[in-house]
Amino acid sequence: MAVEFKKIEGDSIQYFALVIILAAVTALGFYAYVLDHKMGLNGLSNRVPWGIVNAGIPYFIGLSAGSLIVSALAGVFNIKKYKVFSRIAAYMAAAWIIAAILSIALDIGKLYHFMNAVRYFNPTSIFSWNAFLYSSYFVICSIYLLVQFEEMEKATRFMAGLAVFWAVLVHSGTGAIYSFVYSKELYHSALTPPMFIVCAITSGLGLLLANLYFTFRFTKRELDPKLIRGLALIFAGLMMVLGYFLAVEGLEKGYIPALHEAVQFVFLTPTSGVFWSFWLLVIFGIAIPIIIVLNPKTGYDLRWITFAGILHAALVFAERFYLIIPGQVFPEEYLPGYELESLHTLEGYIVSYTPSVFEWLQVIGLIAMVYLIFVVGVKLFALIPERAVEEVVEE
């Protein structure tokens, strides 16, 4: 039996109230950016030029890549029962990459600076390549979604494969921004690109699980728990892989004598916010969601699976914070083996970074914008199937 996708009517008071709330939060986020841009209302400094808004860039790209890979399960891996989620996942992937590109725009400040990536393209710079990868990734997402709307089976399979390949390439490039920085002890790691990919799939899938639950519930459409259970098991398995990557990277750095102080600062200093961002991710973002999914009492309950997905996705943002901030606040060792007694700058000392309310509002505003795009999209486009059950597949 073929999958039948339909728009929602979207004529209820609750629908319009949700649109207004999301639009207001989005506008508040952009207003916070204007104030920050004019008056510098942030916690950044010369030592910490990348803050929480910058942490949103790899986070949003990861959510996009994760959603897109889930969307391609039917086309690439021939798991036809997940075709019912292919459109909604691809649409969310496009929405999240828009948020990522806007995060970059907020960081750049002046939009015409985007042209510099073309005018002064540097083939040896990962930043130059990422400018091409991100923009082309959005185009691929859009074409992939379009061929799904047109029911072009061969083109859909081809675009699904290309989308997965490009999603892996994009997130590897994002991870390479940090892992290729050899001078920063807490950045340089060959494990960062593959860890980024796994983290992208888990966070994207976790948030998609919650998105599916709430969408089908509030549109009063049938959602088979077996389908969600299958995705939840994939989700749990990949979280275990992510935990393994984090453990290996931590142990690798811990065994390097030169990194002893840096490792102690990140993993064993409770007075540091970086310490909490890491351990909260491990305990509440990985361990607890895995227990929820694998526990027979909670693993079949859509509400618990939704909670696990939201918990993991939220704390992956803490992982992005843990990745970006420590490499900046911890000092570089300019002369290994020597102690610098006189410094006229903050170089050589651990500095602090606390995100301002205006930085948080920018991130929250971008998230609200993504869900505004989604809420309007389900009214304008046929993204959601009438019913999502295992029997409703394309033969």
Curated annotation (Swiss-Prot):
Transmembrane segments: 15-35, 57-77, 88-108, 126-146, 158-178, 196-216, 231-251, 274-294, 305-325, 364-384
UniProt KW keywords: Cell membrane, Electron transport, Membrane, Oxidoreductase, Transmembrane, Transmembrane helix, Transport
Superkingdom field: Archaea
Main localization of the protein described in the UniProt heading: membrane
GO molecular function terms attached to this record: oxidoreductase activity
Membrane topology: Multi-pass membrane protein
Subcellular location: Cell membrane
Family: Belongs to the NrfD family.
PANTHER family to which the protein is assigned, alphabetical: PROTEIN NRFD
Function: Has menaquinol-oxidizing activity. HmeB subunit may function as a menaquinol-oxidizing site. HmeA, HmeB and HmeE subunits may together catalyze electron transfer from menaquinol to cytochrome c.
Subunit structure: Consists of five subunits: an integral membrane subunit, a cytochrome b-like subunit, a cytochrome c subunit and two iron-sulfur subunits.
Protein name, UniProt field: Hdr-like menaquinol oxidoreductase integral membrane subunit
Species of the source: Archaeoglobus fulgidus (strain ATCC 49558 / DSM 4304 / JCM 9628 / NBRC 100126 / VC-16)
Gene expressing this chain: hmeB
